[in-house]
Amino acid sequence: MTTWTADQRSSIHNMLNPRSIAVVGASPRMAYGGRMLAAALKASARVNVYPVNPRYEEVQGVKCYPSVTALPETPDVVCVVVSSEQVLDVLNESHQKGTKAAVVISAGFSERGTQEGRDLQAQVAAFARESGLRISGPNCLGLANVKDDIWVSASSRGAEGLGGSVGLVCQSGASAFGPFLNRAIDSGIGLSYIISTGNEADLDFSDFVRYLLDDDDTKVIAGFVEGFKDAKKFIEVAKLAAERGKPIILIKIGRSELGAKAAQSHTAALTGLDALYDAALTQYGVIRVSDYDELLEVANLLSNSPAPAAKGLAVVSHSGGISSLTADMCGQIGLDLPVLNDAARDGINGVLKGFGWASNPSDVTGFANSDSFPEIMQFMANDPAMGTLVVASSGGDSQATQVIAQRDLAKEMPLAFLWTGSRRETAGLDMLKKASIPVFYTPNRLASGIRSLIDYHDWLGHRGTSGFPETTAINAEQQAAATKLAATSGIALSEHHSKGLIAKWGVPITRESLVQNADDAVAAAGEIGYPVAMKADVINLPHKTDAGLVMLGLKDGAAVREAFDMLKSNAAQAGAVGEGLNGISVQEMVVDGVEVIVGVSYDSQLGATILFGSGGVMVEVYNDVALRLCPIDKSDALEMIADVKGARLLEGFRGRPAADIDALADTLVRVSQMAAQLDGSLAELDINPLMVLPKGQGVKAADAVAVFQV
């Protein structure tokens, strides 16, 4: 990854693992400067801490220095808690001292929404680039090395003894050191680091995630992001996380923003910005969740669970109602609770002796807290169809001990606990937390978490062998065609030119002829074979059907002549005259295929995106589509096809033959390579409909429209 350097890693390492800390703006008052100093001083036995403030000789019992340059050593990190107007001066002093890392708590930059604030932040960013002093912030709450109890943070909350393997990165400092930290403490979820990135004038969310990929103490990365400073960089980080098998779990806000924009094609109208992010995160293995609790619970589950050996879920509970509700929630989200095999069923029935019954989910009634409970868990765990064990109970001390022992006995099997008792601290619940048993408090959240665990490892197993597709080289013929059409920037190309373009990338198109008079139209129809379709080949009018510019099912010469005259008239009424009308296209009718849409759009943040969905004129009504970033491989293409509800028609429906799904997948791959190779110059592309013919007969593009941009 070209954006990642040794200096960058070293600077972040100094922020998170400092041996010396300077707090500029340190104060005896417990405002930001005072809290930051107090937090740092908790590690003063291991870390040299230097208050810097010319107004004091001593702060909080520690000698205070007038400036960074007056310090007895070069600090690993300088914490800046001064007015926004003073920040650049402090950064310059720090650079003169040789410091390579700064955490800027100060606010008053771009978050103010003023030009003055934006300009000041731009100056901070420029200083970081030119000096090599890397900056977290401004307008952040700092960072914390939780596992080593070193807090470079202006938060009033600490968390002694909370060290663990979940690395937390948040753009919002108030969220990082507020609800996330509070919930982690309450739930006993151990963290390795807490990082707030603030306005990201220099280092951004992706930089810190990238650092955590190299950190052996961090098994899972949890994040809260409002928007990516560089979305493509995050995608590269996500790819690297997949290669290393380190999960990223993310809250990405903005689900309610539909990203509506003026667009000429169906594809752009169907592709909201959040839908793009959702597709991209899924494509690269990032687990997207909705809220604080879900983020931490899923992160805790993945950090304390091996990959399930099977997809089946075994549920054991002391309550028939709870076990049934849990099974219902699991079933709704697509999890499987297999029937017990003979050995498990007979073994459990032997233990229960008529009090309850052997099933999955298993209601063990009065035996839930007995000495027999470990045997029941073990019988279920030994069933090879079971990959994950769930215990649902209000649990006492003895049962918590038994569950912990079961986890230690079968370390290769994920185990989760659905706690049904009071969430007030009890000995049993406390034991489970301290033993790092993943605990959930509602059946739906448990089901969602286990779904994420299974899906992630399934996805990882596939990507671990196939990797990610690369953009292939564009050939000379393709480049020439694209270069010629790029001069039409912003204009919706005619169908004839759009089809000619996609044909260069191996997309099959209908047989057709562009004519200028009725006699030639009749001759072309005779050569193609009746029935035929006829269309006015116009520019800048992508939805031809709405303007009466498409005639279908023409069966003879008389119908062709009549259609020619009508299309010319309708084109004139639509304003398509002169250079706006290339002619009338006579085309073969494809009548035995399934209509689908294949499209491309380009997003300035994420790049080229391919869309697949149910096709035809009603595509925007049904919005039955799947998205991926380009390029894709064939397995991605097959996943996209499976994601679309209307794709059932491709499998054969009510006596219709199965369609050529293999050829469709190949076409999706070709179009994705085209979009990736053109890298933004192709703004939009619709192939709608693409006709998927019966198995073995391929596909044909019956219509297409492309839009280029400079």
What residues fall within each predicted segment?
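Catalytic-core regions of core metabolic enzymes
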Residues: 1-710
